[in-house]
Amino acid sequence: MNIFEELKTRGLVFQTTDEQALVKALTEGQVSYYTGYDPTADSLHLGHLVAILTSRRLQLAGHKPYALVGGATGLIGDPSFKDAERSLQTKETVLEWSDKIKGQLSTFLDFENGDNKAELVNNYDWFSQISFIDFLRDVGKYFTVNYMMSKDSVKKRIETGISYTEFAYQIMQGYDFYELNDKHNVTLQIGGSDQWGNMTAGTELLRKKADKTGHVMTVPLITDSTGKKFGKSEGNAVWLDADKTSPYEMYQFWLNVMDDDAVRFLKIFTFLSLDEIAEIETQFNAARHERLAQKTLAREVVTLVHGEEAYKQALNITEQLFAGNIKNLSANELKQGLSNVPNYHVQSIDNHNIVEILVAAKISPSKRQAREDVQNGAIYINGDRVQDLDYQLSNDDKIDDQLTVIRRGKKKYAVLTY
């Protein structure tokens, strides 16, 4: 099975400009290709991972990746299928975000070894050297307004309004392809299916300005089995930066993937062989309650993104919280595992009766209910049941001198911080 066939089997090919010609190029020799990442935030997220891992698969097959950070296009904003104009960021912010994204990409691509080692490029390097007049004369003349307005990504915005700034975005992305082809012989661009219009602007410019053929391959925008856009947890993006989404949170995200999606996601997001995935699928279907596919998915992706130690820690937090063994975890581990739990800041540990704390931390709705909860054995401090109405919090209840975990019943938590 050649690399293109494997990508198709894994569900990673959505659209190509000329599949037959692309397969021929990929099988006849080394292809230089690129994927672009605009710094619209200070971290990449799971939505970017499909293109990143596809790029890595091609590198493992011997082809040469160029990772383009859009220092210039990030200043403009991509209008593709967006309902409204993006907020423009300052140059300083975009530069800072660009550097962070470069660091994240080095986790997945090999920038050091072999003749196909990855290269990092930033389109600010060439766009900052082009005058507006030169850009209009040397690039703009190859694009008709009719051609630009025919793009689905632009059509959606015509009625609501689109600025010239965003309208020109596709020409800038097209020029990226031309520049990389001219300087590095890049002949293939990879990106999300929502980028098709911008990406084919590049092949159009290559054809008209240089009389060359370029290839485009889009990866699908991933949705779950209900049609919901993939990559968000509780409406928030799942970031690749551990400070924005902890390894534990990422682990839980994958662990909670629906059964109907789990095997498909193993093909897309892991480097397990198709034979290994087929074996996992057989075992998974025989005992879905054991969630083998989800556990494998969580292990593989968290290890890939954050490393084996982070995976082991996330697994340990999961197991200890499930067993109620709060004291077996450090304060930092508890902050990961209980990040969505309400916090109540306590100025001083002194003179805090358990009943008062339960009400103040909104664990119990009233003092009467709090007293009943304590007497009925429903209250736990750091995993230990408390049934004494006169119980006073003390320094012994602090974990790593930072926090105390209170639980009511099986699921209602609060974290006291000091």
Swiss-Prot record:
Positions binding L-tyrosine in this chain are 34, 169, 173
The UniProt keyword set, sorted, is: Aminoacyl-tRNA synthetase, ATP-binding, Cytoplasm, Ligase, Nucleotide-binding, Protein biosynthesis, RNA-binding
Q: What class of enzyme is it?
A: ligase
InterPro entries from the UniProt entry: aa-tRNA-synth_I_CS (IPR001412), aa-tRNA-synth_Ic (IPR002305), Rossmann-like_a/b/a_fold (IPR014729), S4_RNA-bd (IPR002942), S4_RNA-bd_sf (IPR036986), SYY-like_C (IPR054608), Tyr-tRNA-ligase (IPR002307), Tyr-tRNA-ligase_bac-type (IPR024088)
What Gene Ontology cellular-component terms does the record carry?
A: cytosol
**Which EC number(s) does UniProt give?**
6.1.1.1
| Motif 'HIGH' region mapped to chain | 39-48
- Look up the record and give one Gene Ontology term from the biological process aspect: tyrosyl-tRNA aminoacylation
All disulfide bonds of the chain are: none
Every copy of the S4 RNA-binding domain together lies at: 352-418
State the compartments where it is located. Answer: Cytoplasm
The superkingdom listed in its UniProt entry is Bacteria
Q: Which reaction does it catalyse?
A: tRNA(Tyr) + L-tyrosine + ATP = L-tyrosyl-tRNA(Tyr) + AMP + diphosphate + H(+)
Q: Which residues bind ATP?
A: 232
Supply the PANTHER family for this chain. Answer: TYROSINE--TRNA LIGASE, MITOCHONDRIAL (PTHR11766:SF0), TYROSYL-TRNA SYNTHETASE (PTHR11766)
The family note in this entry says: Belongs to the class-I aminoacyl-tRNA synthetase family. TyrS type 1 subfamily.
Quaternary assembly = Homodimer.
Q: What does this protein do?
A: Catalyzes the attachment of tyrosine to tRNA(Tyr) in a two-step reaction: tyrosine is first activated by ATP to form Tyr-AMP and then transferred to the acceptor end of tRNA(Tyr).
Q: What is this protein called?
A: Tyrosine--tRNA ligase
* Gene name linked to the record: tyrS
